């Protein structure tokens, strides 16, 4: 848990900094036309590195690889990714960043981690909501789940406070909301509201994912 928390918090701070300083042309369009940004690559590199440093035999199944990043027309993106990662790990080279990204594997064993370095890249690009999602799976069961939301208000009733919160679930021990940069936490539970009229519903912030005629 300590390593996972450290990794996802560090990746969150990385993403917050990148978003604050984000420049035009800081994303690549993949074959499926979905965007991938400096933050996607850097977040994956950071988390894969920290997990593999602590658990060298563990597999990480993640979304990106460095193939697009290494293309001549994307070398500026690679330089930017390396620069931001270098701020966290001084002395880091572009080759090392690519090797950390490529620690991701497409094969799995009884124990493996699964990572989405940025879930909601479009939201990230427009300064809206996105998440960093990490889970540990053993023998087909999720043992640990983490979701960092760097741009989400920790308390919707107090929007003047700084943004960023973290959600942690541990098998057999419950679920918690935590501070992104602190030790404060509160236990989460399923709502006791049974009347759907009184219930709160949530849906994707992306219109294409929230078509009420389909979903």
Residue ranges and their predicted role:
Residues 65, 123-126, 148:
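Short, flexible micro-motifs
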Residues 43, 126-129, 161:
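Short, glycine/acidic-rich beta->alpha junctions
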Residues 131-215:
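Acidic beta-strand-loop-alpha-helix segment within the catalytic core
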Residues 34, 122-123, 186:
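Flexible, active-site-adjacent loop/turn segments at secondary-structure boundaries
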Residues 112-137:
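Glycine-rich active-site/cofactor-binding loop and its immediate structural neighborhood
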Residues 71-74, 125-127, 157:
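Short, conserved acidic/polar surface loops in the N-terminal third of protein domains
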Residues 1-118, 152-153, 180, 200, ...:
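N-terminal subdomain of lithium-sensitive/metallo-dependent phosphomonoesterases centered on the IMPase/IPPase/PAP
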